[in-house]
Amino acid sequence: KANFGHLGTHFDVMNKEFPLSYLERNGVIFDVRGIDEIEVIDLEKIRSGDFVIFYTGFLEKAGYGTKEYFQAHPQLSNNLIEKLLDKKVSIIGIDCAGIRRGKEHTPMDQYCADHNAFVVENLDNLESLLMQNEFTINTYPMKFSEMTGLPCRVVAKVD
């Protein structure tokens, strides 16, 4: 049951309750292709409550489910994650297997959830958002109890 929640695009909810107010959020995307340890972004673009997306291009490069995809994906620096939490973002989204690799993956997901920010992994089709200045993200999680991950559908609404 626990592994089912971590297939495809999903939230790492870490047994927390996903607030209904998070279903629709303002979105902001950062093009971080080619960066292995993502440290610097324009934090001024981020507002409290935003769904912050990192487009690494790694899903297309490595292919979902490959060994490389799960073990060698780009990651956010711990310092950047702290800054995102200080900005009180609602959701951190990325187009790879996580915001941290290896043994740091699960503890960082828990840390974010404990700070009311959820991580959405394995996002797809992000390149279509790169030219958008403003957009809204709607997130539709499947409802299961006692799971650390929830499969979800993430849809961007652009003007």
What is each residue range found by the language model?
Residues 1-159:
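Active-/binding-site microenvironments in catalytic and ligand-binding cores
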